[in-house]
Amino acid sequence: MGSGDTRGESSLVAKPIEIILNKLPHAILAQQQFQKYITSPIYRYLSKLLLFREVAWPESTKDTQKGQVGIFSFQNNYADSATTFRILAHLDEQRYPLPNGAAEKNLPSLFEGFKATVSIIQQRLLLDNVDGATNSDKEKYVQLPDINTGFVNKTYSRIDLTHLLEDVETNVENLSINKTLEMDELTRLDSMINELESRKLKILERVKHIDSKSTNLENDVTLIKDRINFIEEYNLEADREQSLRKQMEEERSSEASSFTQNEEAISSLCDVESKDTRLKDFYKMPHEKSHDKNRQIISETYSRNTTAFRMTIPHGEHGNSITALDFDTPWGTLCSSSYQDRIVKVWDLNHGIQVGELPGHLATVNCMQIDKKNYNMLITGSKDATLKLWDLNLSREIYLDHSPLKEKTEEIVTPCIHNFELHKDEITALSFDSEALVSGSRDKKIFHWDLTTGKCIQQLDLIFTPTHSDIKMPARSLNNGACLLGTEAPMIGALQCYNSALATGTKDGIVRLWDLRVGKPVRLLEGHTDGITSLKFDSEKLVTGSMDNSVRIWDLRTSSILDVIAYDLPVSSLDFDGKLITVGANEGGVNVFNMERDEHWMTPEPPHSLDGDELSRRIAIVKYKDGFLINGHNDGDINVWTL
């Protein structure tokens, strides 16, 4: 095959390509080298053909380089002219106009930014070489050309001024571009700062949530430690608790059959039903309170409005302070407890002898109340965080009969009818009336109970301000009845309920009057400057005693103070029957105030059963009902008076 054949073959190959390519403008050919993002397959194919034509047959592009354009530029054997035009005029997304949002920013182009930056770099290099030191950042963009104003004012050369004007305008334009770049950088930094602020707020919220959880856990730790100290202090780690714990662990680890589990569940339900049944049966039983015919003869021996000492009842041999007592005078039953004595003793008030005892509490009994209406029962509250309802008739029978076992079932008989167990700390005050029981505890909670079912009706939460909750107030020492500074007063020092009305006295010195129907305080009586230890109210008046060495008499109708009685020592206990107020103010005798006659006097110092210092004897608790006054001393003696 000769050279002529080769040229002919080449012309045969190039001829159809020239139909498409020979007529294309040179500008379009130059653009094809940069089309990296073209999506049309035909467009990519045409670009490759253009590049191949320039390399293989450079002479074929001569006509194009001469600028021969026209209608023949779009003629070919593969597509019509309109289709070829659309293909060759295609613009990809990179060549689209900027959106309105970007256009509104009016940012400098890449080339403009490059020009402005290059001029700055050149000036910086020149200054660094000349001065040998770097200027401050504020001079970075203000390196202007040195313009001699005298030359400008004196020259008449239009060419020189034109060149100088161009230089100045160039610098102005560069400064404008630099300002735009800096503002854009500032906007970006503001956006970053806002994002960091948002992240900071989120982190602070997480930290706050973590602090809340940490506080709750710290409260749990404090509660657990207090409970451990409480158990260690009173040595309450009994064998019964150990056996129960061991039994619970065995039940968790064992794989008992479903039949056994059902049987245990049924037995537990039966136990609950038996407890509820016993409580219901207790109210159905006839309750004949112990009545002594000699009581009327004895009471008539002493005339009213005169103070007469009747007897002293020694509570125990250890001389511990009386912590709680109550009595029902018409039937002559007295119940009392002393410090670190877990057993409540029942006395015949007319003969001064013990007729029963109530074992069951695991720690000191702090408060108690005898039902004065229908049932011969007693409710006690203890440091073991439980309340117990006792059958006093049954306690007499067990104590006098000395037969703790039933004949048929051999079941242990206990005078405790029901346990109220919801508080998490020691019980400090209780009061019941009709079918409702209210209890206050060191855990800052007040529970309202239904006596017929033994279930809690509602919970009342006390809220103290930080200044009140953290203050250290004086409190009565249980082992000597004296007031010791530096100890913390009871959170709930006293309370009394009557129907739906409830009055509470707390360590912040505030008396709160509650409506049990809504479970909220309706009035606050503020006046005491220290913790309240006792209170009593009737239909018109409320009397309160406090650690601030005072007794205050309030008018419930106007919430105003009617009278204030000051003492030398803190008030540990008081009682009120509408006419007489009896006050134990850590003195040897009981202070009596007759409101009708406005008279004050003190009971004389009675003889006591234990040897000791007369000056160290203090009144720890007082109770007054129907002309009978009973007070408990810090040495364990109980005195009975008629007023």
Swiss-Prot record:
Changing L88A: Abolishes interaction with FIS1. WD repeats lie at residues 317-357, 360-400, 422-461, 479-526, 527-566, 568-603, 614-643. It holds the Pfam family WD40. Signal peptide: none annotated. Residues 74-126 are annotated as: Sufficient for interaction with FIS1. Belongs to the WD repeat MDV1/CAF4 family. This is CCR4-associated factor 4. The lineage of its organism: Eukaryota, Fungi, Dikarya, Ascomycota, Saccharomycotina. The gene is CAF4.
